[in-house]
């Protein structure tokens, strides 16, 4: 198994998630809300995933590498998507944030929020964007 290639792929996908956080960051700024949940999440993802995406790899991507990459991508995208929810302070635990993120990226549509409209506009946009990205 080509572990370096899998890690490089994971880093690149997580960088795409970090890039997609720029949209709700803009929504937060537009509505005068705190951009910190998104800025912090983007910073964490850049610090952890940029070195992975720049890693040198050998040739060859095999079927088992693909299976490992897809499984790990689902897990890591859910964790990365939970970061803005967590840093916003609008959720009671990281488990709730992870559930909300996984629900979005898998297009399940389930939520733990009793009053969705009470969340900030940036977080609502991020929640909607996770559902849209999951549907792609």
Located regions from the model:
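Membrane-proximal intracellular helices of multi-pass ion channels
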Residues: 1-136
């Amino acid at each position: 198994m080509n572990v370096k290639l899998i890690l490089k792929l994971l880093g690149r996908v997580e960088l795409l998630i970090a890039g997609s956080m720029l949209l709700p960051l803009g929504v937060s700024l537009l509505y005068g809300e705190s951009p910190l949940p998104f800025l912090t999440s983007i910073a964490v993802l850049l610090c952890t995933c940029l070195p992975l995406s720049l890693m040198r790899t050998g040739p060859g991507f095999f079927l088992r590498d693909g299976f490992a990459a897809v499984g790990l991508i689902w897990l890591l995208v859910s964790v990365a998507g939970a970061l803005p929810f967590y840093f916003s302070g609008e959720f009671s635990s990281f488990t709730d944030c992870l559930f909300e993120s996984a629900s979005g990226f898998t297009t399940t549509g389930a939520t733990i929020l009793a009053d969705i409209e009470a969340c900030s506009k940036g977080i609502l946009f991020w929640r909607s964007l996770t559902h849209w990205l999951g549907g792609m």
